Amino acid sequence: MLTAMKLFNKIIAPLLLSAALVSCGSSSDEVDPKRPIFSPLDTTTMTDVQKYVQNYFGKKFNVDIRYNYEDRLASNLYKLGPASEAQALKYLNLMRYTFFEVYEKVAPKGFAERHTIKQLVLFGTLGYGPTQNLLGEAPFGMIQVYDINRLTIPYLGGDDLSGFNYYYERARDNYIQTLYHESAHTLHQDTPVPEAFLKLTISDYQQDNAFSYWYVRGISSLTAGFISDYASKSPEEDFAELYGTYMVLLPEEWEQLMKKADHKYKPDSRYTGREILERKLAIMKEYLKANYHLDIDVVRAEANRRICAKVNLPSAEYYKFVKDDFSMLPPSYYSTVPKD
């Protein structure tokens, strides 16, 4: 079984060693509806993949996706490379199966269309910067996901055990978790994070020192009530990281993280990190039900069912996850796409 310790090291250690690989690099995730971001596509010159994007993701889920490199959409602060269409298709199929279809099946009707990703741009490489390398960012609400060209969907029949575990963790933690993290930002933009959530760790948010603060002191941010170092950047990132991480971890993996958090950050701290995290989670659950009629545990169970795997023997559900060739257009595409 994937251990929480391995998962924690997988997420946190590379961040520190590379001066922070982070999933959300913008100081503002707010959507400006009047800001023109995309130019209309010429449908007469679309590839099959572009038609799949428009007719499935665009029309069904109200999301605008671009994967062809456009310099005007790339950050001026980071070096970015283009995503290949083959890798973009693989990512789109992964996103469809582990994200949009999860909400479509168990969330309230219309939730995915109104409260998830609206604008998505894919780049092939990491966002290479002078002090940090990014997995993605969200400038002006336009979510950007990087490193698409290195996405691999593992299959035990084709990978040895160590290779399977490595690629599985990368797919889950670097790509799927990022989708849930970023979608959480759309929720708190509509309805602010509850004040009770903010007060729990209001004095411990580190802003731009979110990574170095814990590393230099040799302290686990879990004990301070943060699910990751990056969660300590701000209340908004705290909310999004908690949402995204809780959504993709199996219950036993979550419990192992809670055991690591079951200590006090400071000798005079009133609560352990576990107590703070469990209180934050309870507040989040209440917030989601009250404002969006969303039961995060129901959504999480469906997400887990689709993406769960065990170290020694992937489950039957995981084989369902990889039974379709994610490098190909889905069969439904050919029966639904309008004929030119």
Model-predicted regions and their roles:
Residues L2-I12:
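Bacterial N-terminal signal peptides that target proteins for export
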Residues A19-S23:
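C-terminal motif of bacterial Sec signal peptides marking the signal peptidase cleavage site
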Residues C24-A112, R270, L277-D340:
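Acidic/polar, low-complexity intrinsically disordered N-terminal segments immediately downstream
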Residues D29, L89-L151:
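Auxiliary, metal-adjacent structural segments of Zn-dependent hydrolase domains
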Residues L77-A86, L161-R170, N174, G225-K233:
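Second-shell loop/turn segments in exported
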Residues S162-P194, A240:
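Active-site recognition of the HExxH zinc-binding catalytic motif
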Residues L179-S221:
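Short helix-loop boundary/capping segments
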Residues Y205-K285, K289-L294, L313-E317, K323-D340:
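Metalloprotease/metallohydrolase-associated module, dominated by Zn2+-dependent proteases
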